[in-house]
């Protein structure tokens, strides 16, 4: 999908992305999104088997990847040649939020803060690079937008009928 194609047919920009996540055991699950398998698990100190990043780490990875794409596309739009982009993405989370029922804690289960540090080696003055990073990381990143602005999430139960024996 190109910008010109979206100018001609704006409705074609509306997408529904989807995948399937299956529980394996304990805290280990596997997601299938397009043709990509993504494992998730918890660390051993919180009852997992450490067979993949935990879900909050996957959110940080998605944020870092999304900002990287936004920076690369923004630089290309401006004719700026990039030599490298590197991001450090970190988030503060209080596990009492996840275990709040057991601990009677009044703490959110999600991140309290997320910080992204970006290093860019580019053929452009520092002010131009800063503008590209701002545009790529704040203006056009869908993941940044989802984390900054509330998005309705609906969890619906579909009861499986046990197989006949």
Model-derived features: positions:
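Extended beta-strand/beta-hairpin segments
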Residues: 1-61, 73-165
């Amino acid at each position: 999908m190109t910008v010109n194609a979206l100018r001609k047919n704006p409705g074609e920009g509306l997408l529904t992305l989807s995948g399937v996540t299956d529980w394996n055991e304990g805290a280990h699950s596997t997601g299938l999104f397009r043709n990509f398998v993504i494992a998730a698990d918890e660390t051993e100190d919180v009852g997992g088997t450490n067979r993949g990043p935990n879900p909050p780490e996957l959110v940080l990875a998605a944020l870092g990847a999304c900002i990287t794409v936004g920076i690369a596309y923004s630089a290309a739009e401006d004719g700026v040649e990039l030599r490298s982009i590197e991001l450090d993405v970190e988030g503060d989370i209080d596990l009492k939020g996840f275990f709040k029922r057991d601990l009677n804690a009044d703490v959110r289960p999600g991140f309290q803060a997320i910080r992204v540090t970006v290093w860019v080696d580019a053929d452009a003055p520092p002010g131009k690079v800063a503008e590209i990073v701002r545009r790529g990381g704040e203006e056009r990143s869908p993941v940044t937008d989802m984390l900054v602005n509330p998005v309705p999430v609906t969890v619906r139960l579909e009861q499986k009928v046990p197989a006949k024996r």
